[in-house]
């Protein structure tokens, strides 16, 4: 006995739920099969007395993320701004330097040129890469065969710029610079709107959070869909050899549908058996695309003591000894439940996972006390953390990364349907892929691909642009004339070299004219 419907959606994260909602609103009979005992996927809002609510997974939204903002608003959710009123801190070589703005200031002029050149070159290279087809970039092969470590070493002359560039990669994609393709990372930053947009709180990707937590997006769609959402149903088998697609779950339920949307991370396709087998390129692609490593940590305090010292809670922390490289204030908008959120990133997540929860908390508090210069940081009232590396139905967080050589070879199959299976998930997005915004884009696009396949909408309606959010408008990202035209360090050296040669030649000519050069 099988359950019949129009579309089975595999995965009840934001992408799968957004797809299911659109199909349901279009009058189709849809079933969502979710492996876990909850919806939300890589978003997860924990609720208890100590925290009220806390996002242990994806949390941040900001300007230009118009789809998630529209969907959340439709579901009755509101946003609030992450605190960035006071000063940020850059902690480097054991010292804390307060600053304002998205990037830490640099005082050494040579180092400044190096930093400026790195950010500018990242954005310049990104402009060469098509958001919807990075493998079509003019230098795609060359950039894809290079790791971000190689690119950083090539672009940065100073240790200071190399360290900040490395932290930037670790923070953006929860992976090491030697693990990721330069082409893929350049694409990733580009499709988030560039270096400033992706890294910024104000006017950037971390500007806001949802009041009540981001888990509500998926939960409220589940409320709308009712018993069409089936929890604790890991999909193990998809059969496309008959008139309808058959989908089997681990508890041996059968679902029969005209179409399927796979809204899980690409590599989790490995947990499903396919009949007929997947095409060669997809079969290999899903074995080659891992997810990043991160432990998200939230330390709670009696009050936001850092604000009294004119610090907003954002800390950018350099150095191997520091467990956390980046923090943000996670205090509730009302000013209660004071907290600092920090990420343990990439290899540090693997290393520090060996410790106990209590040992990690101790390390974090000691670090925050040092960076903030506040012994109050040693007196937490509560602690929550989530190690996403141990989640068998995510495989890691925030998102899938592409090692060198994979994107140009296999990238084009990411969203390519396999007969009646269509692919969603934030990884398949073309704008803010890796974020909740990308999840919504991908889910709704996959849903419209099916509506088109059923003859309900024309092909040119599959991809739709999104009007700008009226509540969260974007300010343009601007650069100064100097930032655009200052030379790089090698450029400066060449300039000095040319000037020296020119000066020496001119002096020699002058000396010769005045008879000051004696011929031997």
UniProtKB/Swiss-Prot annotation:
It is found in: Mitochondrion outer membrane. Residues 517-520 are mitochondrial intermembrane. The modification N6-acetyllysine is found at residue 52. The chain crosses the membrane at residues 490-516. The modification S-8alpha-FAD cysteine is found at residue 397. InterPro entries: Amino_oxidase (IPR002937), FAD/NAD-bd_sf (IPR036188), Flavin_amine_oxidase (IPR001613), Flavin_MAO (IPR050703). It comes from the Eukaryota. One of its GO terms (cellular component) is mitochondrion. The record marks 156, 365, 382 as: Important for catalytic activity. Its EC number is 1.4.3.21, 1.4.3.4. Residues 2-489 are cytoplasmic. It catalyses: a secondary aliphatic amine + O2 + H2O = a primary amine + an aldehyde + H2O2; (R)-adrenaline + O2 + H2O = (R)-3,4-dihydroxymandelaldehyde + methylamine + H2O2; a primary methyl amine + O2 + H2O = an aldehyde + H2O2 + NH4(+); benzylamine + O2 + H2O = benzaldehyde + H2O2 + NH4(+). Signal peptide: none annotated. GO terms for molecular function: flavin adenine dinucleotide binding; monoamine oxidase activity; primary methylamine oxidase activity. Keywords: Acetylation, FAD, Flavoprotein, Membrane, Mitochondrion, Mitochondrion outer membrane, Oxidoreductase, Transmembrane, Transmembrane helix. Its cofactor is FAD. Catalyzes the oxidative deamination of primary and some secondary amines such as neurotransmitters, and exogenous amines including the tertiary amine, neurotoxin 1-methyl-4-phenyl-1,2,3,6-tetrahydropyridine (MPTP), with concomitant reduction of oxygen to hydrogen peroxide and participates in the metabolism of neuroactive and vasoactive amines in the central nervous system and peripheral tissues. Preferentially degrades benzylamine and phenylethylamine. Belongs to the flavin monoamine oxidase family. Monomer, homo- or heterodimer (containing two subunits of similar size). Each subunit contains a covalently bound flavin. Enzymatically active as monomer. This is Amine oxidase [flavin-containing] B. It comes from Pongo abelii. The gene is MAOB.
């Amino acid at each position: 006995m099988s359950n019949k419907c129009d579309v089975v959606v595999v995965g009840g994260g934001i992408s799968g739920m957004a797809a299911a909602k659109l199909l349901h609103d279009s009058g189709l009979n849809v079933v969502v099969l979710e492996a876990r005992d909850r919806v939300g996927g890589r978003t997860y809002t924990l609720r208890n007395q100590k925290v009220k609510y806390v996002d242990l997974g994806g949390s941040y939204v900001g300007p230009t993320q118009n789809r998630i903002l529209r969907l959340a608003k439709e579901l009755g959710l509101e946003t609030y701004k992450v605190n960035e009123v006071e000063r940020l801190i850059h902690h480097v070589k054991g010292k804390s330097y307060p600053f304002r703005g998205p990037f830490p200031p640099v005082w050494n002029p040579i180092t400044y040129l190096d930093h400026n050149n790195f950010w500018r070159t990242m954005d310049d290279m990104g402009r060469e890469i098509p958001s919807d087809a990075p493998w079509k970039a003019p230098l795609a092969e060359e950039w894809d065969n290079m790791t971000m470590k190689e690119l950083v070493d090539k672009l940065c002359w100073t240790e200071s710029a190399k360290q900040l560039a490395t932290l930037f990669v670790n923070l953006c994609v929860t992976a090491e610079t030697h693990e990721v393709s330069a082409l893929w990372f350049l694409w990733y930053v580009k499709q988030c709107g560039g270096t400033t947009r992706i890294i910024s709180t104000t006017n950037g990707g971390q500007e806001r959070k949802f009041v009540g937590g981001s888990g509500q997006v998926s939960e409220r769609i589940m409320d709308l869909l009712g018993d069409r959402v089936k929890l604790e149903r890991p999909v193990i088998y998809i059969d496309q050899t008959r008139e309808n697609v058959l989908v089997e779950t681990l508890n041996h339920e059968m679902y029969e549908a005209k179409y399927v949307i796979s809204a899980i991370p690409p590599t989790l396709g490995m947990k499903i058996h396919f009949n007929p087998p997947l095409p060669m390129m997809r079969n290999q692609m899903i074995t080659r695309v891992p997810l990043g490593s991160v432990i998200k940590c939230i330390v709670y305090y009696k009050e936001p003591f850092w604000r009294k010292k004119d610090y907003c809670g954002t800390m950018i922390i350099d150095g191997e000894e520091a467990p956390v490289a980046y923090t943000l204030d996670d205090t509730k908008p009302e000013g209660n439940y004071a907290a600092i959120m920090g990420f343990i990133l990439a290899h540090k997540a693997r290393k520090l996972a060996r410790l106990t929860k209590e040992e990690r908390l101790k390390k974090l508090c000691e670090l925050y006390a040092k960076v903030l210069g506040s012994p109050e940081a040693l007196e937490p009232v509560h602690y929550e953390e989530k190690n996403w590396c141990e989640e068998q139905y995510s495989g890691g967080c925030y998102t899938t990364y592409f090692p060198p050589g994979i994107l140009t070879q296999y990238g084009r199959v990411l969203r390519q349907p396999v007969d009646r299976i269509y692919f969603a998930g934030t990884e398949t997005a073309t704008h803010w892929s890796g974020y909740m915004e990308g999840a919504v884009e991908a889910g709704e696009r996959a849903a419209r691909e099916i509506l088109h396949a059923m003859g309900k909408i024309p092909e040119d309606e599959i991809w739709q642009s999104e009007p700008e959010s009226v509540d969260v408008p974007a300010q343009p990202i601007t650069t100064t004339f100097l930032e655009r035209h200052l030379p790089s360090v090698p450029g400066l050296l060449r300039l000095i070299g040319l000037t020296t040669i020119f000066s020496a030649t001119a002096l020699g000519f002058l000396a010769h004219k005045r008879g000051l050069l004696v011929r031997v």
